Regions:
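Structural/interface elements that position substrates and couple domains in central-metabolism enzymes
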Residues: 2-462
């Protein structure tokens, strides 16, 4: 086990200060009779529902989106990678979904998996956590375990979540230190580690980090997740678990920024960055490949550096390296815009008035997730320059209003590529026939190396 807290040490401490509530919940988790509540039925929450249902726990899902709740009630799925058969199997195991938060009182453990976006000033927007905590508090009862999974800055669990929960009408307090009395509830942070579209690692094989507000909460959290994950990793405090999640994603953000910057240098030097990365990957130690692209997307990697930078200012610390990585990645859609303009210019065409087909709007290949997708930024930038933009994505027949954009665009058919002045590959979905696209298009600009192995005068990689 990595350096840090060992579960046997946590268990020893917790058992010496156990309460009737602690023992009761521990037993329920062991014999699978605990009622599990999952708040937020999106890309993180719904997979959690399925994992617990597979282990014969009775699960209740909570969401403010009635459309999602109704879809699940009918045995349907709104996430492409989760088939309806899995929803129906969960229902057979007792899963129900509701918008009624009063049913929180029925739960033994409540997992919070709600969004934590940034506001327009790149500052943390924790309004969903606040609203969820305020919805839980009136129905909180002694002995419940509340676990926050949403990605956030270190200190959120202790400084934000717990004080709101402790405003409950029963006067219950979060268990602290050795106080696990009968008027307490248990609190922990356990960061989600979902990787949409990654089929190489089973969800149950992803180790689960858990940091409780006290040792008893850590043990209960590990007991809870130990039922669905093959390994749990206890740490000494929620803030350690919160920082762990940020480190994981900032590591990726910084390395992606590095290869994005190297890509722009290699373009000027006439060197193929993809060939460079492939060659460097043959080194059996000290190197891990990261790949350039049109920008970064998803809920975590584009946002987490700004969460930590914001919190660091409270401690008079400037995280310049992290902030620079965020700036490099944020600038990549502008690099794509410039590359399209230059490619059109070489064909004696202007970007203003050009017909551009954007292939792929999901933030990465083979998923139905638009969150923070660089494609949305690129479409808006092209439109502002006067381009006539269309798009195709096998997972999105329509792109409407989102957190930052209101594009209101319908997917066009995947045909007649020659009618467009430029076909821009933003997301390299496996469904696309790239050889055909290059063959039938006037100009193709590839931001993902999707056309590797293809050579043509109308093909530009950027």
């Amino acid at each position: 086990m990595p350096a840090g807290l060992h579960l046997k040490d946590v268990m020893s401490t917790a058992q010496t200060v156990s309460s009737a509530h602690f023992e009761s919940l521990h037993k329920k988790l062991a014999d699978r009779t605990a009622r599990i509540g999952v708040i937020g039925l999106g890309y993180v929450g719904l997979p959690l529902v399925l994992l617990f249902s597979e282990q014969n726990f009775r699960v209740t899902g909570f969401d403010i989106d009635k459309t999602k709740v109704d879809t699940l009630a009918q045995g349907g799925s709104y996430i492409v990678r989760i088939p309806e058969t899995e929803i129906q199997a969960a229902q057979a195991a007792g899963f129900t979904a509701t918008t009624d938060y009063s049913r929180i009182a029925e739960m033994d453990a409540v997992l919070i998996a709600v969004p934590t976006p940034l506001n327009d000033h790149h500052e943390p927007d924790l309004s969903f956590i606040v609203a969820t905590a305020e919805a839980i508090a009136p129905h909180l009862r002694a002995g419940q375990l509340i676990v926050l999974e949403s990605t956030t800055y270190p200190g959120t669990t202790e400084e934000l979540l717990v004080p709101i929960l402790e405003k409950n009408p029963r006067g219950l307090k979060a268990a602290r230190g050795e106080n696990n009395g009968n008027s307490t509830f248990f609190v922990a942070f356990s960061p989600e580690r979902e990787d949409p579209g990654n089929d190489t690692v089973a969800r149950a094989d992803i180790p689960k980090v858990a940091g409780g507000f006290n040792p008893a909460a850590t043990e209960l959290c590990c007991k809870l997740y130990g039922a669905i994950f093959h390994r749990t990793v206890p740490v000494s405090a929620p803030a350690v678990a919160e920082m762990t999640k940020l480190l994981e994603n900032i590591y990726r953000c910084v390395n992606i920024a590095l290869v994005n910057e190297l890509k722009m240098l290699c373009l000027r030097m006439g060197i193929n960055i993809w060939e460079v990365i492939q060659a460097a990957s043959t080194k059996p130690f000290g190197f891990h490949p990261f790949y350039p692209g049109p920008g970064i997307g998803g809920h975590c990697i584009p946002l987490d550096p700004f969460y930590l930078s914001w919190k660091a200012k409270e401690f008079d610390c400037q995280t310049r390296f992290i902030e620079l990585a965020g700036e490099v990645n944020t600038a990549m859609p502008y690099h794509v815009l410039a590359s399209v303009g230059e490619a059109l210019n070489r064909q004696k065409k202007a970007l203003n008035g050009a017909k551009v087909l954007v292939l792929g709007v999901a933030y990465k290949k083979d998923i139905d997730d638009l969150r923070e997708s660089p494609a949305l930024t690129i479409i808006e930038l092209l439109q502002k320059q006067g381009a006539e933009v269309s798009y195709h994505d096998p997972y999105f027949p329509f792109v409407g209003k989102g957190r930052k954009y209101d594009l209101q665009m319908k997917r066009v058919p995947l045909e007649n590529f020659g009618q467009y002045d430029c076909v821009l590959i933003v997301t390299d979905h496996s469904d696309y026939d790239y050889a055909r696209i290059v063959r039938e298009s006037q100009l193709v600009v590839d931001t993902r190396n999707a056309t590797r192995g293809i050579s043509a005068p109308n093909l530009v990689r950027c």
